[in-house]
Structures are given as C-alpha cells and as structure tokens.
Amino acid sequence: MKFFALFIYRPVATILLSVAITLCGILGFRMLPVAPLPQVDFPVIMVSASLPGASPETMASSVATPLERSLGRIAGVSEMTSSSSLGSTRIILQFDFDRDINGAARDVQAAINAAQSLLPSGMPSRPTYRKANPSDAPIMILTLTSDTYSQGELYDFASTQLAPTISQIDGVGDVDVGGSSLPAVRVGLNPQALFNQGVSLDDVRTAISNANVRKPQGALEDGTHRWQIQTNDELKTAAEYQPLIIHYNNGGAVRLGDVATVTDSVQDVRNAGMTNAKPAILLMIRKLPEANIIQTVDSIRAKLPELQETIPAAIDLQIAQDRSPTIRASLEEVEQTLIISVALVILVVFLFLRSGRATIIPAVAVPVSLIGTFAAMYLCGFSLNNLSLMALTIATGFVVDDAIVVLENIARHLEAGMKPLQAALQGTREVGFTVLSMSLSLVAVFLPLLLMGGLPGRLLREFAVTLSVAIGISLLVSLTLTPMMCGWMLKASKPREQKRLRGFGRMLVALQQGYGKSLKWGLNHTRLVGVVLLGTIALNIWLYISIPKTFFPEQDTGVLMGGIQADQSISFQAMRGKLQDFMKIIRDDPAVDNVTGFTGGSRVNSGMMFITLKPHDERSETAQQIIDRLRVKLAKEPGANLFLMAVQDIRVGGRQSNASYQYTLLSDDLAALREWEPKIRKKLATLPELADVNSDQQDNGAEMNLVYDRDTMARLGIDVQAANSLLNNAFGQRQISTIYQPMNQYKVVMEVDPRYTQDISALEKMFVINNEGKAIPLSYFAKWQPANAPLSVNHQGLSAASTISFNLPTGKSLSDASAAIDRAMTQLGVPSTVRGSFAGTAQVFQETMNSQVILIIAAIATVYIVLGILYESYVHPLTILSTLPSAGVGALLALELFNAPFSLIALIGIMLLIGIVKKNAIMMVDFALEAQRHGNLTPQEAIFQACLLRFRPIMMTTLAALFGALPLVLSGGDGSELRQPLGITIVGGLVMSQLLTLYTTPVVYLFFDRLRLRFSRKPKQTVTE
C-alpha cells in the first residue's frame, strides 16, 4: 500500500522517473548497432596450403593429413574438414561459440609451426590462415573492369593495392581476389625446336633461373667515398628474356626466343571472371565472424573514394553486390510494423474505455516501456535486428496489458463513485499482485531460452532478454506511472463517450451478457467441457508430430549464389564457355539486376556465380520462385549444372557446397566410400523431397597414367626424377624464377606452348637428356593410357568424407527431407563402414528438433514453479496452465492453414503463447480466490463472478496482444519471411485460446477445488490457502 502511495502522491517524482527511463532509452537507441540477426556466427578459421602440380591424393596424404593431426589437437575445435585438389589444400576449423577467434588463431599458427617439419620440402610457402568462413556469402563484391588494362594488370591492382587496404578495415575477415592471376612472364616452349637444338627443358629452366638472380653485391670504399655495387642481374619483361642465351650448339648460340614464345601474361591462364558479360576482376569481401555487417559495409563504402584514387582513371571500380540494402530495408519494415502495432493497441484501448483521457494513460505507458528497453539492449551489447525489433513489436501487446489491468480496475472504482486518488490507490492494491504474477510468470517462460546452448540459444537470447526487459519496465510503469496518471487525470464519474462509440459499448455489454449465459451452461456441463479440453491436448500432440518442420524460415535476401559443376573431364576453355552461357541465361531474367561469376584455379570443372535480384518492390516473385523458374532454363545446358540457392543470414558450417543443406558420408575405408557415395547420391536424387542433389566427391576426372619401364630407364641412363621433372616443366605451369618489383613479386612460368599440347600426341614429342647428353624420347621408356582419378579428396576429422548437398523443392520442409533421407539409407542397406550424418544447418536442425519438446516442457515447468511460489499452491498453477492446450492447437492449425512449417520462429511464438494466454486465467483465478476469501462465495459463484467481472480486461488484453501481432502477419516486403510465422502463431493461438479458455478455465478451477476438498483433511473448509 505504501509503495503505491509513494508514487501516486508524488506525481513530479514519478514523471521525472519515467522521463529518465525514456531519455536513457533514446541514448541507447542512438548507439545501438544494426544487424540482420543477433550475432550467431561460429568462429571459423581457414588454413590454406599449396604445392603446385601435386595431385589431390598427394595433397591429401602429404599436406592435409599432417596439418589435420596437428590442428585437431587444438582445444575447442567442434568440426574440422578439409578439401584437397590439384596443388592446393584447404582446411576449415569451426570452433565452439565461446572460443575467442583471436586466441584460436594463435593456436592455429602454433599448430602449423609444429607440423612444418612433416610437410613436403617443395612447398613454395608456409601454410597460411584466415579468420573467415569461406562458405559464407560475401558481404560485398567489388569489380574492376577496363578497356585498356589487361586482366592480369587489373588483378595486380586488386591484389597489390586494393585488397590489402580493404583487409585492414575493421570487420573485414578476408578479401578473395578472383577472375585472373598476377602478371608473369610466360615461356611457351616448342618441343621440336628443343629437340633439334639438343636442349632439354631442365636446361632452359636452369638457364632462366641463373639469368635472373637478385643477390647483394656489396660496396667499394676509398678514403673519402663509398660506392654501392649494382648490376643488371635481373630480367623483368618478356622482351628482356627473349634474347637470353640458353645453350650453345656447334658453337652457335641458342637463344630463348629460338625455342619458345615469350610473352607478358599471367601466372595461371586458367582463370576467368565476368560481370554482366564483361571480363572483370572480382574482390569478394567476407566479414570476421564477430563483425557487424552493416558497420563493415559502411566502412568499406567510406573507403571506396580513396581506393578509386589509388588506381588509374581508366579502371572502373564498381560495387557489384552489397548485402546491406536488403538488411536495412528489412529493419525499416520491422520498425514500421512496430509503429503500426503501437497504434492498433492504443486503438483497442480507446474502443474499450471510450475515453480519450483514459486512453492517454496506456498511450504514455507503452512508449516509455518500449523506449526504455533500448538502454538495456545497449548495456547488454545487443543490436537492432529483426528478432530484437520483433520482440518489441510483440511486447507492445504485453506492456499495455499491465497498464490495462490497472487502469480498468481503477476506472471501475471511479464509475462506482470513488474519489480519483482513493480509486487509484485501492484499484492498484487490488490488482498489484495480479500484475506481478502476470509479468513474472511471463518472464519465467524465457528462462529456459536463456539457458539454452548452441546456435538456437544464441539466436533466441536477444529476443528473450529484450522482451523480458520490456515486460520488467512495463511492470514498473504500470505500478507507478499508470496509477499516478489515473489518480490525477481521471474524474470520479462515468466518462462521457461519443455517440459513435455507444454502439461499441452496447455490443460489449451484449457480448458480456451472452458470455454469462453460455458460461452458466458450461458450468452445468463440466464433463463435456472437460472432454473438449482433453481433445485439445490430444490434438496438440498429433499436430506437432505431423506438421512439417524446418530450422529457420527461408529468407528472400535479394541475393542468390550459384555453384557450377561441369563434367569432370572438361577443359578450362569449355568451362569458361559454360560460365558465359549460364550468366547469359541468368542475366536475361527480368528479376535479375546484376550477375558476377568466375571459374578456374585448382578445380577447372567448377565455378561460382553471385546474383543480385531487383528490389522487392520491383519484382512480384520471391527468390525461391525465381530459382524455380531459372532451374527449368538452366537444365537445358548440356555438360554442366548450375545449382542456385538463396543467400541466408544464417548458414552453419564451413563447407562450401552448391546447395543449402548437407548430408555427409564418412568412412575409414576410402574404397567403400567411393563405391557407396554414387549409389546414395543417385537414390537421393530420385526423392521428391529433395532438389538439386549433388556431391563434392569427384573421382572420375580424366587422367593420363604414365607407367615407367624402370629397367629401360636404367639402361638408357635416365632416373625417375629427371622424367618427373620433364613432365612438370612441360605441363605444370612451373614457376621457375621470381621477378622482384617495388610493390610485388612476379613469376616466370615455363611450360610447353599450348599449341603443342592440344591432344595426347604431345607426350610423344617429349624427350629427356640422359647422363650421356643424348635426347631420349619419353615413349622409349614410358607407356601411357587414359584412366580416372579424383579431382578432389575430402576429409572430416581424419576420415575420408563425401558431402551430398541438396535444396528443398517448393512446398517441402527440412523435416520431410530428413525423414526421406533416413528412409533411403535404410532401404539401401548401407554397410556400417560408411556412416551418414547431417551437417551444417541440417545438423543444427536435427539437434533443435530433439530439444524443442524439452524446451517447451521446461518453460511450462518454470512457469508452474513461479506461479506455485506466488500462490503458495500446487493446484492453482495447474488451473492457470490449463489454458495452454487450446493456444497450441490454434497456433499449429494457423501454421497449417498458411502452409508455414514449424520453425525456430514459430517455436518463439509457442513460448510467447505460454506467457500470454495464462494471463486470462490469472485474472480469473485471482478474483475468484479473493471472492472466496472475503465474499464468502462458493467456488462456483466465485469463479462465475470473476469471469464476468474480468471479461472486459480479458478481452482488452487479448485483443491488444492480437492486434499487436496482426501487423506481423499482414506485413510484406523485405524480411516478411521471418515476421509472418511469429505473427501467424500468436494470432492463431490467441483466437483459439480466447474461444476456449473462457469456458475451460472455470471448469478446471472447479475440478481442482472439488479434488482438493476430497483429499483435504478438513473437507468443510472452503479455502485452505
């Protein structure tokens, strides 16, 4: 009593307290960062190593395995995968959430150092690492194009000047440059000319290496001067290399230009990048795991004018893709939804109270509660994101509930003739415990979420804390500011209402009278009502089991990623043509705004595309509908497949794949894995629940297998090293010398001129100089035949692995796909030596599925404990919780009606309903208990009177919550995929709950009262609490 009086009789202090809360919230709002979702990125580090010319199997055994053994001993590694291809290995380390990325990086460097002695000596550089997830979509893609500069020169500008500067920007984790390679002097040898001159490829390599040497020469001094010695020991351009003497034949000089074509070119000619049909260099920028995407993008944009000044004017630097516009648009949509929710909630209050003066009170309480929450969000290190803003949108209906309960009860006393200040004090005292019970039990719902681990726990924590803080501030405001305003603003008389609102008042009275009559019938047919309640419980179980489920709603971020997978024996030239064909198909689609792509590198049969769609208001289709339309056109391209997927704000795991979800096969028997993977993949491709099924196992690449006749080699004076060196010199794009420039280092690359390697007969033109100086053709001591060989070798942990990727067809859920895969694996009878498990997002979905029911039960148990403590009763909390089954049925039926799968967002809605719908029961039970204690009424009379007396606030609070969530259902535009499931769940649950709990709660109350009396030692005592 004294607590409430302190604020009611000190209006200035109460107002200033509210102003202080609001000002703190405004300051917090201005400092909050912006993000699409809460920070849920796993710490990921990528380790890269190269050994030019080494086969995938050699890279896996000699490079990947030693590194994996060393890296696998690092604490906190939750997953380690590797992929080895021609000349390169990449190892992805995913760490636990609580592992600091910088500390993990230090451990990774130490592990690399420890494994260094076990790695091949021919590696051109030590393994390196990057603190970025290569499977994440770039947050920004920059392109460089020019009509005057070559691709190699553009790549040089990008890698030498732009990439290092961008990498230093806060939040940037990795800048990957693609589309070409660094400039180089390429030496294309003519094997027939070499044979005629009696010059071996090793002779050429040695001559070039010896002619381009950068060594210190020292200095000369006399008594007064000092001269530094400088020589012309370096060759820098193709023109300088052409006259180089590499051999003398019969006294005549053999120059490099006589036996080779020397050009200024690039290190690796098997790279290509394009943007909108124009050759381009791509800078793909990825953020650090803990970085804020909006802040990072803004920092990059601010740096672009300075970057443009560092490159020639003839080079066009453009932003080809930017993830931030759709994120900003999505947040703007949520903010608009929040404003609409506040307006609708206040409208509901006005319609029920029919007084502008009374409506002002909750109209003030709601903004104070919501704005004050921003201060707590800032102190907790949260961001303004879709989930936290949705929490505030839903909180609109919650925070007004407390004010409504207090206001309505005070207004009831005023209408009875009580003085305003006395009515404020008496009314607040009567419902103070009720409001406290409602708020604490609602916050209790989120305690299990706060204790939940893993990615779902991280994802939902900001939502739960934000909503809990808003409810806490609302509780404070409703017990301080609201009664004070009622006491000083409302009059001790029945408020005058406008004529146009009298009809609503009469309708509400008629509705209340009708409810009273139907409630009497329900209380006289308790068994029938009880059967209905039991039926809703059974229906809940059936609906939850049968409803399609997924991890997170599929988002339309306006960005697509595409992975090209061509025939494993395809040449680079043909692959570049496939890239151009696919890009043209994509570019011609009316919903596409920009297309960039690249191919080449160690995997010549693959490529990547990044597609920016037009804004939502300029297209009528969703991203998935566009993918479905393009899939039909892309299927007509022979010899290659382009797999498209919509970029999501949440992607788990470090695997780069061509689809959204992964299923990984593991085995310690590589032969068994290679035998069963094609069978499993073909089976999964036939399932209607899956689309775009593909695999990263590529073991059918074309190979030319050379078999040495060692006896003949010994007789001819040739060793294996010389033969292998010949092949590497001829076909390996061997880097044989380094050109040092002020800004970078460039290579001299030697190979047989591609004009002479168009078919297998090129091997017949190769020869080796034996120990007697004679030229011995390769065909004399070697035979060759075509064979198949892997293009890549993949590991997970230290086991051989193959990952099958898949997308979901329209109308199918992740639970459908998971069940179908499990059935297929059982039908195939896969041996125990091959183990299958879901990976990435699909793995997290499986884990979340297993914990959802436990989480809901934990929330109900927590609410029961809190209510039991508040009511000092084991029974009354059960009465209050009996409202939940009807809400669950309504939520699940609504999801089915809108064809929306049960996702993590829908789970949030269920958790919220646990907190919302019990408010009705709390108001009924509180007043019934009070009537029994002080009114000497029977339980049936007490609960009947409580239901009628609290009918108006029950309708007000329910409609306020419903209208607060309704804009989420009706919202469109960016980010609506996240908002709609939450709104659908809450609105459906509230409608069904309101229809049933007004009858089931009184019946359950009477049932437990009779049960209590039956087992009570004092059966004549009406109330035992």
Swiss-Prot record:
This is Multidrug resistance protein MdtC. The lineage of its organism: Bacteria, Pseudomonadati, Pseudomonadota, Gammaproteobacteria, Enterobacterales. Induction: The mdtABC operon is transcriptionally activated by BaeR. HAMAP family: MdtC. Keywords: Cell inner membrane, Cell membrane, Membrane, Transmembrane, Transmembrane helix, Transport. It is a multi-pass membrane protein. Belongs to the resistance-nodulation-cell division (RND) (TC 2.A.6) family. MdtC subfamily. GO terms for cellular component: plasma membrane. NCBIfam families: PRK10614.1, RND_permease_2. The gene is mdtC. It is found in: Cell inner membrane. Its main location: membrane. It holds the Pfam family ACR_tran. It comes from Escherichia coli O17:K52:H18 (strain UMN026 / ExPEC). The chain crosses the membrane at residues 3-23, 333-353, 360-380, 387-407, 431-451, 463-483, 528-548, 853-873, 875-895, 897-917, 953-973, 984-1004. Part of a tripartite efflux system composed of MdtA, MdtB and MdtC. MdtC forms a heteromultimer with MdtB. The MdtABC tripartite complex confers resistance against novobiocin and deoxycholate. GO terms for molecular function: xenobiotic transmembrane transporter activity.
